[in-house]
Amino acid sequence: MRIYKQTNKQIDMKNKLLAIIASTGLVASASAVKVNDNLSINGFIDGSYQHVDNSLLSAAGDSTPAGSPESTTDQSLGLDEVELNFIYNHGPVSGTISLDGYDSFNTGNGLANPGDRVEVEQAHITYSLDNGVSFTLGKYGSALGFEREDPQGLYTFSRAYGGSSANSFNLGHIDVNVVEGLTVAYSADAYSIAASFENNEDVDGEEDELNLEISFAYTGIDNVNLGGGYFFDNQGNSELETDVLNLHASTSFGKLFLAAEYIELSRGNSVGDGSDLDGYMVLADYDINNKLGVALRVSSNEMDANADYEKVTIAPNYAITENLGAIVEFSDVENNNNDGNEMAIELTYTF
């Protein structure tokens, strides 16, 4: 069992969901180094070995020497991501700055400009009132999606959705879905709601109207967590808009944790082939003992009206120490009728 991926999720799921919704992207971690009464630092180092056997690789044709048999296998070994988070709290004011470095060639994270990069992943300040209302301003990720940002937000190594529409379905993947905006949130004992007025990073707000994301979380039923919301895409040309509906639920029975998610993309006529797309995920995670656990995930997402991406993943995980965890993942993938197998070994150190 990965301490920071499973035990914290099962014991503190309610608090985490409320915090995520209310603050829209606060960094989660198993521990933090306290610098003084107001400032703490946490982060992680994540690396992996990956092996892919997929007939789609031979279709690329750019990595196989002329005259050689087309290769359908690929492998990589390296440092995936390093993150350092500075968290400030003083009375009603809190703030987070997340510095992120990653190798997007090794992680395959869908970035437009792949390669080694170091950047400010998140930077936001929050002002909280005594009545449960809070205001967050800055750069942050979406509050939608069951799977969250960074290794701590996943029960597996890989993300559920893939193919050409992966970035649209992996809502919580902050490396590809980050915005700049203002969130107004309200948090009560059993529920929270939030409205984020936002634009994509580095987009001029004068070019189109602000996008709007409405999110919610409900924890009023014992051992049950409900969440989701709706993203309203407001562009200058409505034919280019993609609205997003997200619903997810989770529950636990002793050592067994279950979750399910549904996502629907309503696309304008000029987006792809103009068809609406949907995807789903079902996850089961079982703690065998205090150190060993296993996750099973089944997921599917449409890439266009005639092509689907389907994935079955099994991921045993082991807590080597309180701060060092390992995952061995095996996935069977069908990408538009092309079959493939993926294997990964991941090590993550948190501090």
Regions found by a protein language model. Give the residues of each.
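Gram-negative bacterial Sec-dependent N-terminal signal peptides
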Residues: R2-V33
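Outer-membrane beta-barrel pore domains and translocons
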Residues: D46-Q50, D100-Y102, Y140-S142, S196-N200, ...
